[in-house]
Amino acid sequence: MVQADPAGAGGLKRRLGLFDAVTIGLGAMIGAGIFAALAPAAGAAGSGLLPALAGAAVVAYCNATSSARLAARYPASGGTYVYGRERLGAFWGYLAGWGFVVGKTASCAAMALTVGLYVWPGQAHAVAAAAVVALTAVNYAGVRKSAWLTRALVAVVLAVLTVVVTVCLTSRAADPVRLDPGAGATAGGVLQAAGLLFFAFAGYARIATLGEEVRDPARTIPRAVPVALGITLVVYAAVAVAALAVLGPTRLAGAAAPLAEAVRAAGTPELVPLVRAGAAAAALGSLLALILGVSRTTLAMARDRHLPAVLAAVHPRFHVPHRAELAVGAVVAVLAATADVRAAIGFSSFGVLAYYAVANAAALTLTAAEHRPPRAIPVIGLAGCLVLAFALPATAVVAGAAVLAAGAAAYGVRAARGSA
């Protein structure tokens, strides 16, 4: 059984309650889905965007349930890296952790670039790198400050999205005919869109990876995960309906800033600056929570010597994995200077779907005494993760599989040397 290190012995300090955990998950999910994944998903699914959203939500719910039960059983930082290791063996835990770290590092770059593209399109890469540096400093100063800032960002974003949905759905430009999922949608396109939209739902992983910093994790994590996921699904569905109603799938797919285009089409161009500000706030919230979660999984893997042991240090004053956070921040800052947003989303989705496939497989091994979920939930989650992963664009599948294979090969080399 995994034991969380006590805060006074090199471990992390339990500061987060239910509301903090929910807002960290919301901050990670809402920014990613609404402002980054909606347009490419519409491009893949066309008029089948809403069924794709529903499919992604089903898989996300199964993953969330499996993750919550496992997190209650193993309340240590690392998420599925820990669950896979304890339930399936060291290799599967390592593979899950590797998929999470590389996939979510790509997510960080995508969110940083989203900030840059909305704040200052002509200097997007510079703004993205600056955002990474600033938020890494916030996380370094302590997770409690991160939780408060995330709470403020979530409130701003939800207010902006409420305005967008209201304006679009009450506009004369809204046409319910555009919501018909039967016009030109294909099964392959819907599955690919679901895989891209899954990128948006994956924020609840941040709640599980904060296992050592949540008060009463056995109760808090299983409650926080479905609450955050449910709120996010309602928000996504409302925004997707509003955007489709005024733009239609073709125009939505081609929009560089789809929600800004939606309010313009609804006859309220004066709201475009507000939407751009909301997009930047959403992406900042996602980036803040992403850096937080990736650094905690890096910490867990470093403790087990699957990553350099120097990254396992916890700051004696701030009680955060400061070296892991600085390393993650440095890598993301470099990627933000070179990455393409849409390619990063596909790559990230593949890695994170692999991560949750391991989580569902691990949940299948829980006993009734360990509060095992109904068997259908991890089975559907596992199958759904595999189907959506290989339905992604070919470049994302090839790149993601290659990186996972490289990680597996590195593990094999270490095992052969007797150090795995």
Model regions: which residues?
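Helix-loop-helix connectors at the membrane interface of multi-pass transporters/channels
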Residues: 1, 5-6, 85, 111-127, ...
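Hydrophobic transmembrane alpha-helices that form the core helical bundles
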Residues: 40-43, 52, 61-140, 154, ...
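C-terminal membrane-solvent junction of multi-pass transporters and transport-like membrane proteins
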Residues: 135, 149-152, 311-322, 353-399, ...
